[in-house]
Amino acid sequence: MTDAVGSIDTPDAQDEVPESKKTRKGGKRAKKGPLKRLATFYRQIIAELRKVVWPTRNQLTSYTTVVIFFVAIMIRLVTVIDYGLNHAAKYVFG
């Protein structure tokens, strides 16, 4: 019978953590100061915004047109349903 991957007899190399990477007693890492954490947060925001694929002007125009057209259709649909339900309520309740 073969041993399963990561069994106790043969530990994986990735399970070993170098001494410099180990956490302190209790499993918590040292806290950074509030300004350091804020700077890291903003750095991460900038890094994520650089990954965004922004639309071209033509794409933006076409997407905006589609959204406005769809919203206009939905407004008309809700208006027709409201008008119909209003007349149905007047018919039922007098």
UniProtKB/Swiss-Prot annotation:
Residues 1-32 are annotated as: Disordered. This is Protein translocase subunit SecE. Gene3D superfamilies: Preprotein translocase secy subunit. One of its GO terms (molecular function) is protein transmembrane transporter activity. GO terms for cellular component: plasma membrane. It comes from Streptomyces galbus. One of its GO terms (biological process) is protein targeting. Residues 22-32 have a biased composition (Basic residues). It is a single-pass membrane protein. The chain crosses the membrane at residues 59-81. It is found in: Cell membrane. Essential subunit of the Sec protein translocation channel SecYEG. Clamps together the 2 halves of SecY. May contact the channel plug during translocation. It holds the Pfam family SecE. Keywords: Cell membrane, Membrane, Protein transport, Translocation, Transmembrane, Transmembrane helix, Transport. Belongs to the SecE/SEC61-gamma family. HAMAP family: SecE (MF_00422). Component of the Sec protein translocase complex. Heterotrimer consisting of SecY, SecE and SecG subunits. The heterotrimers can form oligomers, although 1 heterotrimer is thought to be able to translocate proteins. Interacts with the ribosome. Interacts with SecDF, and other proteins may be involved. Interacts with SecA.
